[in-house]
Amino acid sequence: MAFQGTSRTLTQQSSAATSDELQKILFSPEAIKKMAAECDLGRHHWMRADNAISVRPLVPEVTHGRIASFFKSGYDAGELCSKGCVSVPQVLCAVTRTVSTDAEGSLRIYLPDLGDKELSPIDKQCVTLHNHHLPALVSFQPTYDCPMETVGNRKRCFAVVIERHGYIGYTGTTASVCSNWQARFSSKNNNYTHIAAGKTLVLPFNRLAEQTKPSAVARLLKSQLNNMGSSQYVLTDSKINQNARSESEELNVESPPAAIGSSVASRFESFRPQVVNGL
């Protein structure tokens, strides 16, 4: 199924004409497909043994080149104050496991600058998640705006890097990571307060709690249990013929239901099946 989402990229320009031109670059059908295919924006990325390290730039390479050319032409013409920067206030990753909690493994997720050849985490924007701790939410906050430039053969921007460690014997998908962010392009750049990478462990979803009403089968079982509990007969104080010693003789004893609240009824009431889990 083709990706049908929309890019969350925003622009910060004072000129309506330049803003419209930049909007066409960012929100064209091709640009939207690139955001999905190259960046996995809003999509689930599966971590497999044959894909143990994943590097996803926050801006597609083709889109990066077109935006950089747009800002450069405006800068050379004296219309813009810089060659352009990309600002990402926050990156949010939702991580879920796809194997048993007994599997020994972990994920290392961090935010580097592609201008750094070593791809080191910027400002300690790095977290490690063990398999038995999942699901979890991870957040990153860059402390600066990244210049739209080319370093060597790399288009400089931020990226999300995911490393899979351990999971011996598991060659398939062990975790799913869904990343979302909002990239802004501007001719101005700034620095921001340092905020450490966040890691929030999330309770697994309780599917049974969503079933607020008993099912048809549960209602049927409940009615049957109630009927069984009400079909009780006890001996009354009627006199029995003491001379009837033959085992073949039948004792005809009336058995009306016990009065509510009587000690005899309470004894039988204690043997009624208990109803649990809403049955």
Curated annotation (Swiss-Prot):
Q: Could you tell me the superkingdom of the organism this chain comes from?
A: Viruses
According to its UniProt record, where is this protein located? Answer: Host cell junction, Host plasmodesma
Q: What does this protein do?
A: Transports viral genome to neighboring plant cells directly through plasmosdesmata, without any budding. The movement protein allows efficient cell to cell propagation, by bypassing the host cell wall barrier. Acts by forming a tubular structure at the host plasmodesmata, enlarging it enough to allow free passage of virion capsids.
Which organism does this sequence originate in?
Cucumber mosaic virus (strain As) (CMV)
Keywords carried by this UniProt record: Host cell junction, Transport, Viral movement protein
Chief location bin: host cell
Q: Which Pfam families match?
A: 3A (PF00803)
Protein's name in the database:
Movement protein
Q: What is the phylogenetic placement of the source species in the record?
A: Viruses, Riboviria, Orthornavirae, Kitrinoviricota, Alsuviricetes
Question: What InterPro entries does UniProt report for this protein, alphabetically?
Answer: MPV
User: What's an example Gene Ontology biological process for this entry?
Assistant: transport of virus in host, cell to cell
Query: Belongs to which family?
Result: Belongs to the cucumovirus movement protein family.
Query: Could you confirm whether the keyword Disulfide bond appears in this record?
Result: no
Work out whether the entry's keyword set contains Transport: yes
- Per the record, GO CC terms? host cell plasmodesma
